[in-house]
Amino acid sequence: MAILNELYPSVPYNVLAYTPPSFLPDAGTQATPADLTAYEQLLKNLEKGINAGTYSKAIADVLKGIFIDDTINYQTYVNIGLSLITLAVPEIGIFTPFIGLFFAALNKHDAPPPPNAKDIFEAMKPAIQEMIDRTLTADEQTFLNGEISGLQNLAARYQSTMDDIQSHGGFNKVDSGLIKKFTDEVLSLNSFYTDRLPVFITDNTADRTLLGLPYYAILASMHLMLLRDIITKGPTWDSKINFTPDAIDSFKTDIKNNIKLYSKTIYDVFQKGLASYGTPSDLESFAKKQKYIEIMTTHCLDFARLFPTFDPDLYPTGSGDISLQKTRRILSPFIPIRTADGLTLNNTSIDTSNWPNYENGNGAFPNPKERILKQFKLYPSWRAAQYGGLLQPYLWAIEVQDSVETRLYGQLPAVDPQAGPNYVSIDSSNPIIQINMDTWKTPPQGASGWNTNLMRGSVSGLSFLQRDGTRLSAGMGGGFADTIYSLPATHYLSYLYGTPYQTSDNYSGHVGALVGVSTPQEATLPNIIGQPDEQGNVSTMGFPFEKASYGGTVVKEWLNGANAMKLSPGQSIGIPITNVTSGEYQIRCRYASNDNTNVFFNVDTGGANPIFQQINFASTVDNNTGVQGANGVYVVKSIATTDNSFTVKIPAKTINVHLTNQGSSDVFLDRIEFVPILESNTVTIFNNSYTTGSANLIPAIAPLWSTSSDKALTGSMSITGRTTPNSDDALLRFFKTNYDTQTIPIPGSGKDFTNTLEIQDIVSIDIFVGSGLHGSDGSIKLDFTNNNSGSGGSPKSFTEQNDLENITTQVNALFTSNTQDALATDVSDHDIEEVVLKVDALSDEVFGKEKKTLRKFVNQAKRLSKARNLLVGGNFDNLDAWYRGRNVVNVSNHELLKSDHVLLPPPGLSPSYIFQKVEESKLKRNTRYTVSGFIAHATDLEIVVSRYGQEIKKVVQVPYGEAFPLTSSGPVCCIPHSTSNGTLGNPHFFSYSIDVGALDVDTNPGIEFGLRIVNPTGMARVSNLEIREDRPLAANEIRQVQRVARNWRTEYEKERAEVTSLIQPVINRINGLYDNGNWNGSIRSDISYQNIDAIVLPTLPKLRHWFMSDRFSEQGDIMAKFQGALNRAYAQLEQNTLLHNGHFTKDAANWTVEGDAHQVVLEDGKRVLRLPDWSSSVSQTIEIENFDPDKEYQLVFHGQGEGTVTLEHGEETKYIETHTHHFANFTTSQRQGLTFESNKVTVTISSEDGEFLVDNIALVEAPLPTDDQNSEGNTASSTNSDTSMNNNQ
């Protein structure tokens, strides 16, 4: 049995915090597949899985999110997943893992796919039908299913053969027969795409072409993925027959041609379909056209924009993925408020004259960075209408306030008994992702019945769902939803238009419909580069010029995922870029131009201009590999530096890129790209007479080249060379310890060769040349690229006696005595690390013995520092000891730091922080503690230390620290600055004090310590974090801390009493649902939906952690446990009942509907099925497993009104049981002792007279009778109840 102290324990507890705080569910889990962070996390898991060979598990998690949790949109995830195309992956390539993503049935995971899992093509059909505004015909279904079935069979054979090869150890471990089998499968797949892709868009009917285009876009993506694998992995698969250098060149031509062809085809078909809609004359046709644009954008154009990234020549394999941000906006959703023909858009005129940035559909819609939504002000009315004498509420007007202006949609009446205005405040950090509408269906006070003939429907309530799952109500009556308008996945509402209702009666001029503007969530993020992932990989980033801070003119562009910026002659444009990691980048521009145009290009790093010169942007009209868009042919151009290099050194800060058109023609700018350049170490090997070993044995000869790094290597190694004339073919073999990691063919007879070795977490590698023959003279040039190799250059080496003396003095100063058993009180952990750097720089040859002794001493100092530090992992050797934001990573190899450090990147869509709590049991009473750390670089970093209420809260700016030349006596880092007392201080080091009075083990306030970024472009690199004992408190300090603690304890007890009073009754009621009060056990046999629904969860004041906004507080954790217990009870009820969707929360799914039966939401939030009159009914046929004619069943029904439930069974339904339900209020009625004559039973619910409202119905096995119970007889009973399972679930 759950008790209060288990759910709300006295230890640990803090009025401000709770440990351990778990992550809040991603926003999508609470409402719609909306939150981009959920997709990003699943993508990280897939990336790790591909490299570790566990991708099937990662894909299984994705499929669960799609088909079970309903938190992920299939199409959106696949589109985002294509960003992995540039990853360095094993020899299986990228196509093999994606087979299981495209076809759920082919995902080779231990757990089978969800029973309702479909392939991506089947999952697209509802959107396609919505786009063409009809159901797919049987012929269309047969055509589409047949083509995809053929592809699935080929993909399954490809996958099976690849699995077979990998099970034997890879391609260099299998015989030629298996390799031929696999290459045959590769070529068959390639032929299928080439032959069958055109059939999806070549048809005489416009609908067939349009409905086939989403299929075409996915299949084109798959084909380009396969071609890229052939180009990058083919030489490893089969270098002698099918994937020779000449064949690879041919495939490179194919991929370039197909990118251009597939892009043009999608664009042309889209444009043809768009033209067919013409100029809409009313809101209905306008909405259909916009729905066409929405589906075509998300299902076709968003895929086509990625096609150029599949070209390995243009986007080669690198250390990370590629991220090309989208900024294009979509008009969605359309929300009818009051229209001419019920709550539809039929025959309602459209007026866009008051829409900013619309420009008759050719505009970009309001820029979400310039027009930031602030508030909606709604003006509802309660006014007698001419329909049945009933009051009909509706919306006169809505006032939309953004950061630029306030604009009114609709018309305010001169005189009207208004029930408003109602305000909805909008938080840009927690945007709206769904709009819910409650239509007016209930009678006003005093009315005798329901208005069943409400032909001119109206809205009684609007509510807005935010990204974190919280709801904003417009306060217009109902506030719940019978109609849900979800935005496209990973989008948010950036603006809201309104169109007036135009009629000749008194309602003319007020709002007829609302139209949303949906914007990708990444569109307003800062332009961030250089952000490493957990493996240290840095992505290639592309930012639309539409995100520029000034200049240019926005022009419509459909194919790029963003509108283009037209740069006319003399015009300039600037875009800010924030770099997280100092390093080298290649800068590229994607543009279109109809003529050769000179553009002045300026990269301003705030102290240097590595690019500051005129660049020729050549005409792209005749470019053979460019992609045609609305404004020209788009190509990618690398930008040269002033010294004609293509590598730019960019510091860790915010820089600005400026372009000025100095020519005479327009240039259309799509995006700017930053490609990280990994540190390169080139080794050239000359071996004039080497002997090659056997191709199947480990060579006994010395390797040509070996790594010497003690760090795991990740990245790629480019191999280029030329063999001498008349030489034989050979193999370049790569060994990790005693097995091959990869082989690369070397052609004989003086041919050039080039290839790439992908490296994943390899500590050492040896390179040999081996074959069954003897090699000839030749040279091999190895280009080794390793992103973890650290900075170059030779380390400093101290050889002078005075250097030894200086360093020895500093080592001794770390301790209080010569025994080295205690650290000096003013020594920080970072001080120790500076001394370590100097000790390590002592010459081994000159001071080998002394260096060994000093290293022993500094190691002891480090151990003492770690022992006194109350934080765990202060040097981030144990990152798991910290609570941290999703994108916070551990990084090594900083010139100022011996140990690892943590990088807090810009927040993006999730907060960036680290947090740890020191428990009360580790502290001493009446003691001052020092909190300190080292900051290598920080922008907008907040430091918070809290015991009784955030005693320390500082935001700091620390300039980027560059290491001084290492000397034996001087500091390692940085120019000191003056402090308030006239002394010099180090801006990179912080130190604060916090006082602890009497210990309070019951409430466990402890010391809480956190660092977080408080600005979108902020970042920080920190290390050497400590909380250590300083000194006992003086008498006056004890009195001060006692007073603070007393006040804190008073507030704590007050809040605890309030929360206890709210949660104790809920605990008691949930205990009553379960046998023996065991929340993880079985529910009691007499529990019904009403018992669960009667439990109303309280509203607790602090659901989020006080510091970590993406994690639960203690109160939030309690609410999650409550909801989990209710969900488990509900799931058991669902499992026990024989009927599906008997609670009607999924509308009438699983039921056959006759008449106008549909789900409605009542004023009190009940979701019920409404049968408006005697002509309406719903029915469901069930089959009882393990049927026993003697088994008894119980019917439980909860509803309001007059109706019947019939149960038909027996052969040809000879037996009919009828259960009547006549109650004016919501009441539970039961029918017990039911037996059936067959395993098939048809249950029908129908109205007898007027409106019949059904809350839920269940048909369950009757519990076994006890000694004092008799189950014989067919009896009925009823219980009056005003509760409902469906209260806003």
From Swiss-Prot:
Q: CDD domains from the entry? A: delta_endotoxin_C
Q: Which UniProt keywords apply?
A: Sporulation, Toxin, Virulence
Which function does this protein serve? Endotoxin with nematicidal activity.
Q: Which organism is it from?
A: Bacillus thuringiensis subsp. darmstadiensis
Segments of this protein annotated with the region Disordered: 1263-1289
Q: Which GO terms describe its molecular function?
A: toxin activity
UniProt lists the gene as: cry5Ab
Biased-composition ranges, Low complexity, are 1274-1289
Protein name per the record: Pesticidal crystal protein Cry5Ab
Q: What family does the database annotate?
A: Belongs to the delta endotoxin family.
Q: State if Metal-binding is listed as a keyword.
A: no
Q: Which Gene3D superfamilies match?
A: 2.100.10.40, Galactose-binding domain-like, Pesticidal crystal protein, N-terminal domain
List other remarks: Toxic segment of the protein is located in the N-terminus.
Please list the GO biological process terms of this entry.
sporulation resulting in formation of a cellular spore; symbiont-mediated killing of host cell
